[in-house]
Design a protein with these regions (language model features):
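S-adenosyl-L-methionine-dependent methyltransferase catalytic module, highlighting the catalytic core
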Residues: 88-96, 100-233
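Conserved SAM-binding loop
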Residues: 14-113
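Intrinsically disordered, low-complexity segments enriched in polar/charged residues with Gly/Pro
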Residues: 4, 52-53, 123-126
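Class I SAM-dependent methyltransferase Rossmann-like catalytic core
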Residues: 1-19
Length: 233
């Protein structure tokens, strides 16, 4: 199966339309491919100081970010929130320090399909569902939704064939996209308030809801990008 790990160039171009010269732009967790429009960076690796200027070390799950309220015009966070034990501290801090921003996480489609992560090792017979180090399913239905990814998902009966076809058909379905202004709207689906137990029908239905919502809203995001591109050409 074709994999889309690197940022999609068209998404970069789209985000560039919201960023003008002179803006202060913060990237969270820059990794090996820093956001080209970023002027400031923060992350949990102290070693990044050597490669990036304006870099500060932050524990996203618990720290207050070392910036003033609404200091930044734009904040960019790609493949960060799903890795955190407490992404909600990070969300609140992004809303506090920035006026607008963009969040990208792996989509629920990738998190339920086997071979999304350890596909490179052909000798390894067992393939995890999605990425085994991720703590949350994340999807957009007008707000960001977070559902804890329990190990029981490996044993659930999920027909992934249709989901794989979606991933093969359109590279955009590999990710969840969320563009925001003023503050980030989100919902944490919690046990036992929103589902009785991990692995039961309510939990499974939330996963299916996340997958279906992701397909719809990713399609809308792509249409918005294409519309803006056609209006400017």
């Amino acid at each position: 199966m074709i994999k889309y790990y690197a940022p999609i160039a068209e998404v970069y171009d789209f985000l560039g339309k919201f960023i003008t010269k002179g803006m202060k732009v913060l990237e969270l967790g820059p990794g090996v491919l820093p956001f080209p429009y970023a002027t400031h960076f923060c992350g949990w690796l102290d070693s990044e100081r050597e490669k990036l200027s304006n870099y500060k070390v932050v524990d996203f799950s618990k720290d207050k970010f070392p910036y003033e309220d609404k200091e930044f015009d734009f904040v960019y966070a790609r493949h960060v929130l799903e890795d955190l034990y407490n992404p909600f501290n990070c969300i609140e801090e992004m809303s506090r320090v920035a006026k607008a921003g963009f969040i990208e996480c792996p989509s629920p489609l990738t998190e339920v399909c086997r071979e999304s992560e350890n596909w490179k090792d052909e000798k390894y017979e067992f393939k995890w569902r999605g990425y085994n180090h991720h703590h949350y399913f994340v999807w957009n239905d007008g707000q960001l939704n977070f559902l804890h990814k329990f190990p029981v998902v490996e044993h659930m009966k999920i027909n992934q064939e249709d989901y794989i076809l979606e991933l093969l058909k359109d590279k955009y379905h590999w990710n969840t996209y969320y563009l925001w202004k003023d503050n980030i709207k989100y919902k944490h689906h919690e046990h036992p308030r929103d589902y009785f137990a991990p692995g039961n029908d309510e939990y499974a239905q939330l996963i299916v809801k996340g997958v279906n919502s992701s397909i719809v809203f990713t399609g809308n995001f792509k249409k918005k990008m294409l519309k803006m591109e056609s209006e400017r050409s």
